[in-house]
Every structure is written in structure tokens, then in C-alpha cells.
Amino acid sequence: MKKSLLFALCLGLATITAAAQRNNSQVDPIQPVPTAKQVAWQKLETYAFIHFGLNTFNDKEWGYGNSDVKTFNPKKLDCEQWARTLVAAGMKGVIITAKHHDGFCLWPTRTTDYCIRNTPYKNGEGDVVGELSLACKKYGLKFGVYLSPWDRHQASYGSPYYLKLYQRQLKELLSNYGELFEVWFDGANGGDGWYGGAEESRTIDRRNYYNFPRIFEIVDSLQPNATIFGDGGPGCRWVGNENGFAGETCWSTIPSNTVYPGFKDYKQLQFGWEDGDQWTPAECDVSIRPGWFYHEKEDSKVKTVEDLCDLYYKSVGHNATMLLNFPV
């Protein structure tokens, strides 16, 4: 009897000890999982894109890189009006095309003369990136920048020297305009352009030329809270179309070291990969008008409230975010 009682007590003690150990040990999560930064980013749901630059004044979508900088001359530019409108529309932040493919810079960069510093706007003292950054702070919007890797203006594009120039441009944007919530890298790379007067077509090794690992290191070091957008992330990814929708099933995971700028199987990006080992959720970019830059002929073609509601359900409702472009 005593032996039976002693055995029962030992068994009970062992059970209690094992249970305590299970409760105190941390259960390993199923990998991959999002970072806290990615979770905060996805909770934004909707934010704005603004395409603005030389193309706006030359009625173009993709500038060739040789438009006269003097044509950039806005008379009534009011970034605070932009910010107020975006807040009223329910946007949580805005990303500005600091430099599009034509190479024109909306801030007074010291890396090139092809910038706002040499325009009539404010007698060369303007800085649209800075003005919008301040407006965002005033009205409670998050602020981000788009910096095209492809530059159809620069004679050095395609060479190692251009990479140094591009990194300097990136560091200027990351260092001088407060906290950024997203940094956007376009996947359109290489092709015909002015290239300092060469007027030719240039191709690059899309996987390796830009040295994106180094670029991402620069962003993480100077803007640790910024989500990095690229075709394959790493922070968030392109959804594989510019129509504003994700697949009905849209996994937040992709295979690591597979997706790169110009990725051939880009249509798969709208679905993601169920067995992907890298957490990189989708972002749905779409314009409120047919074009990304402003064109007067499209004034009657603005998306309706019904259109936008449908896009919201097909982007945010499909496990992505909605990046809505406003051409100004």
C-alpha cells in the first residue's frame, strides 16, 4: 500500500513538473513569420502614390531623359493641399516619385544638374520632396520615396560609376527628409534612352547590376523603420500587375533568392507561393486615372467610388495593401 501511494505521488509530481516545463518553454513559430515592421505596414491598408515631375509638363508617361529642365515650372504648387486631400480621402501615407526613369530629380541633389535646382520653380530654390515631407508631418501622413534605378538621362548608366551616383542619391533622400515609411524600387530597368546624348538602348544584368543587397543595407542603416518595396521585396513585393488587385488566394510568402527586378514569372506574384520561405506580402499599385502622370485628356476618366471600393476589396480584401496613384 505504501509503495503504491509513493508511486502515485512520484507520478503526479513528474506530471506537474513536465507541465510546468511546457508552459515555461517558448513554442517555436512556424516559419516564416512577419516582422513587427511588416505587420505595422500592412495595417496601413491604403496609402497614396504621387507621380509628378518633368513628365507632367511634357505630357509623357516615360520621359526619354532629354526634356529641358526649364519646362518644369509649376505656378501654384501647394503640397499642403495635396496632403489635406489625401487625408480627406483616407490615405495613411504618400510616396513621391523623387526620380522617375527620365532621371529628373525633384530635390536639389548634388549628384546631377538634371534636377529641380536648375528649373524656374522658386528660382531654383524649390524642393518638392522637402515640401511634401513637411506637409505630411503637418497633417499626420506617413512619407515615402520612389527612386528609379533606371536612369535614361545619365551617360554612366550601365557602368560601375552609375552605381556610386545612385547610392549617393539614395543616401540624400534617406538622410534629409525625416522618417520614411517605405522606399520604392521600380522593376523597369534598361532599354532605350538619351544616356548623355548617346541615344541608344542599354541592357543590364537585372539580377546583379544594381547590387541590391548593398542598397538594402543602406536603407536599413539610415531608415530602419522603412519597408523596402521591390519586385521580390524584401519588405513587400509587387503584385504582378498595375490593375490594383491581388489573387483571391494571395500568400504573403515567396521563395527566397528567386524573384528579382524583371522576374519572368511575374504573374505568379499576385498569388504568392504557399510553400515560400520568405515573408514578403503584396502591394497593389494602381492609378486613379488611366495614366500614372497627369494628362489633361484623361480628366473625364477618373475612377468612380464604386471602382475604388471594388479595388479595395480585391487588394486589401485579398491580403495585400492598396497603393493608389494620384497624378498631379
Regions found by a protein language model. Name each.
Residues 1-22:
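Bacterial Sec-dependent N-terminal signal peptides
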Residues 21-328:
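Mature catalytic domains of secreted/periplasmic carbohydrate-active enzymes
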